[in-house]
């Protein structure tokens, strides 16, 4: 029987050398293990990541309180439950915590248990996790958003915008798309080196050179695509792919440079320029006309609903507008966005909400309302590759899991290669069809 016999948590280190929670779930006949990621630029509406706050130990970032919550309160409550009853398990976790933002037990405690239970349930059922969650229809490999150049909170340079990404959508298989991304990554490295710029990589494996402007950053990426021998889209594509193989995606992380007191977007790392919400929306409108941009994530700040509305009206018909800090994988926030008519896509980060069931609910709500979903990592990752399984399980069609370096990022890409191989002729790579613009 798949009855939970023990839940055991421990403190491990993530890809930035910070503590995080890992959970083991044991049943009478199966086992599941999951490790929890952590973000650098976090939305104010995210579920609470419980940290110890003892400055003398791991600079206050220890997670022993969360570990203790798993090993006592959660273990005692869930032992004896059927591991295959995921919704019941997740509801029990929510009831145990009893707060709207998981601040009592910690979202990092709840998520580790939720994901480990799913893995134990999959093992008991004799199924890969993507089949266990998604059933027989789970067969879509995601188009990757590959973060090759960094700025903002992810880099100590003069670039305001956090992530410049490539999306190899013009291919028939995930493996070919991955090869394209890797070759562009190496072409970009050679290009930076030829210009005497740094090729050190940041938290997510992307380069973070000291550039003169935000425009130089995107232009370098476009140049690297060409040097790798691939065709990039053109502004005349209006967000479409045409016969191009690669498009650009951005994550400016606009909340990070929004001054709520001034109600201005301040380019504090580069020109010191200050823009109103309307001017910021017009700025992105110009970029979407000048560059082959298919997707912009967090183009406006997390609580600038009016700015989001203007941006959506201006370019939402031809550019995927992804809400990350805006929606924080929260169905209530997403429902508000749908009602207001803002954005057209949601970034899905499992640790923003805290349980697998809530994550799947948000993806389902997005699908029912014509919004796309992008399954995402965090800047602080581990070797855990659950998000690769979730991307295929939900047929999301897109994944954001870093650059083409660092083994914590490669773990997800390599898992997707294995899934594609396992699916064989059933595997489907959506390419341009992953977008609804």
Curated annotation (Swiss-Prot):
This is Enolase. One of its GO terms (biological process) is glycolytic process. Binds a second Mg(2+) ion via substrate during catalysis. It holds the Pfam family Enolase_C. Its EC number is 4.2.1.11. Its main location: cytoplasm. Disulfide bonds: none annotated. It comes from Pelodictyon phaeoclathratiforme (strain DSM 5477 / BU-1). Pathway: Carbohydrate degradation; glycolysis; pyruvate from D-glyceraldehyde 3-phosphate: step 4/5. It catalyses: (2R)-2-phosphoglycerate = phosphoenolpyruvate + H2O. PANTHER family: ENOLASE (PTHR11902:SF1). Keywords: Cytoplasm, Glycolysis, Lyase, Magnesium, Metal-binding, Secreted. One of its GO terms (molecular function) is magnesium ion binding. GO terms for cellular component: cell surface; extracellular region; phosphopyruvate hydratase complex. SMART domains: Enolase_C (SM01192), Enolase_N (SM01193). Belongs to the enolase family. (2R)-2-phosphoglycerate binds at residues 162, 349, 378-379, 400. Mg(2+) binds at residues 251, 297, 324. Its cofactor is Mg(2+). The active site is at 204 (proton donor), 349 (proton acceptor). It is found in: Cytoplasm; Secreted; Cell surface. Catalyzes the reversible conversion of 2-phosphoglycerate (2-PG) into phosphoenolpyruvate (PEP). It is essential for the degradation of carbohydrates via glycolysis. PROSITE patterns: ENOLASE. The keyword Secreted applies.
